[in-house]
Structure formats: C-alpha cells, structure tokens
Amino acid sequence: LIWDVNREIFSIGGFALRWYSLLFALGIFLGYTIMYRIFQKEDKPIELMDSLLFHIVIGTVVGARLGHCLFYEPMDYLTNPIRILKVWEGGLASHGGFTGVIIALILYCRRYPQISFFWLADRMTFPAMLAAGCIRIGNLFNSEIYGHKTDVAWAFIFKKIDDIPRHPTQIYESIGYLSISAILYIIYRLKDRKPTEGSLFGLVMIMAYSFRTYIETFKENQVAFEDNLTLNMGQLLSIPFVLFGFFILFGGHRKLKIFHPGLTEFKKVPAKVEEKATKNSGKSGKRKKTNPKT
C-alpha cells in the first residue's frame, strides 16, 4: 500500500489544521466524555471535571514535550533551550506524556482531596488507552514512527520517507492500545465499577509497556544514537513502567504517601461532635469565683 496522504486537512492563511492535531484532540475529547459519564455514574462532583481536563492536557503536553527533549535529543535542546517551547515543530514522547499525566493527577488530587488518586487513575486507564490509539493514527498521517522494511502483504510504502515497504507500526500500536482499552473497560464493568484500588492502573502499565517493548522490535530507531544500543530508547523507557506496574498491582503503592494526598488533609468534624465539643469548652471556661486569700 502506497501511503502519501497530506498531513494537513486544510490551511487558511498561516494556519493549518493537521490530521495529527485533530486525532490528538479527538482522543482528549473521547477521554473527557468517558470520564464525565464515570463522574456522573459514581456520584462525583461534575464541577471538578473542567479542572481535571486542564490538568490532563497540561500534564500530557508538557510531559510529552520534555520527555522527547530529554530522552531523544538532549544536547540539541540543552544548547538551545528556547526550542523546547516550539511544540509545533514536533517531538512528543509518550513515556514523558504518561509521566506528566501521573504528576498532574497527583497535583489534582492534592487540590481536591475528596477524589482519591487511585480511584481516578484506575478509571482513567481505558480512556487514556483510547486516546493513545487515536494519537498513533495521527502518527500514521504524519508518516512518522514507522517500521523496518518488510515483505508482508500489508506493508506500507511511506512516500514522504522512501520507496521501501515497511511495517505500519503506527497501526499495530493503535490496534494494541484500543484492545487494551477494551480489556480494561471489561474488567471495570465485571468488577461492578469498583475495581481493587490500583489494579487497573498497575495493569495498564504492565500491558501497555510490555506491548510497547515488543512493538519496538519492528520500528526504525528514531535517533542515530539508538543504533549503538542493544535496546532502543522506547524499550529502555518502557521497562521501568512495567516494573512499576507490578509494584502497584501487588500493593506496594499503599506505603507511598505521595499517592494518598487526601490522608494528610484534616477531615471535617461531624456537626454533633463539634457542638458537643463547644459545649464542653464553654463549661470548662465557667470557673467558680473565689475570694482571694489575704
């Protein structure tokens, strides 16, 4: 299959809407819609959704951008730091994006301690994988993150790159992430919307990054220094996430206070207890007057 699709849907003046941007936005929109329904179904404050969206978008973009700059082209960006801000030039790393989302969720739950980190993280797994599947199709339209040359019947010739038939690894990844999203959602429903704390969060890291480690074997390296590595950068970055996923799945997170910000907040005292305490305080304040000794 010859793949020579225009990266831009349309352009007006100096503005151009790309397929990648549209699919990125579609992933965010679908994720937001799913989380909105979950908040409704599980009686969480809907008014907190806008803040959640803000945290997620900022965490994703900032994390993905910094991840690319630090892991794939560190010297280029350290010598010219202003380029880090030029997101429109391309260069986003999913490992950095995932890390950025985790940090964003921690900050969000510190701001709104009525929302548990793992309650939120577990339920965001399948929307996140759905969004990741959309983004990989965006990579396909950009003719980037493509695979090694191959003679399989479904090989793609990316005309913007060369005339060599290659593995369409963007499609492989998209199908994989969408499948993981479906599996996690099925588990969520089988558990009657009450999965064990941290179980889906741990599973998504194990499944997604184990799959990513495997798919990387079909991909071309993204930067030259990877040619001298036994494992490429995508695999090296995936392994810690898989290990952390097992750590979470087997309950190691219960000892990490950073994931339980609500525990450090003062709980609201029930009205009756507070009233009783006030009365007792008033009684203790009424002391019997005595004549001073002379």
Question: At which residue positions do the language-model features occur?
Answer:
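A feature for loop-to-transmembrane-helix boundaries and adjacent hydrophobic helices
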Residues: L1-T294
